[in-house]
Amino acid sequence: MLLAFPWLFLSFGLYNLIAFTKGDASVPRAVFDQAIGSVSMASGAVWTVSLGDAIVALTIILLFVEVVRSARGAASLVDHLLGIVLFALCAVEFVLRREAATQVFFVIVLASLIDVSAGFALAVSRTSRGRGSR
């Protein structure tokens, strides 16, 4: 069952955990703008990584994992259905909750949409290939 788990739920859960426990509903993105580290670059510039940047990076990595799993055919119907549920939850939360009205959460919504779309596209491709049509 762990293999049928949409890994983008991790980004969704992490975002919500932070937004609803550490965030301020009147300024939802303030907590995600906080710096969590910085790196001095060879050019002399300082690259600062915020909490929001880290969540976006995690989301992109998890989206890659999801698409690779779908392309390998290892994804199950349960995984696709849970991905659709995740997208629905993300879309509704983005529209209805002030804490979710941030650029970081929008990237999570977009990643879940891409995951669902890629799953459908790959399933259709496999089905048409199995029938011998192009």
Q: Residue locations for each model-derived region?
A:
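Alpha-helical transmembrane segments and their membrane-interface exit regions
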Residues: 110-119
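Terminal transmembrane helical module of multi-pass membrane proteins
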Residues: 121-134
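Membrane-helix boundary elements
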Residues: 8-48
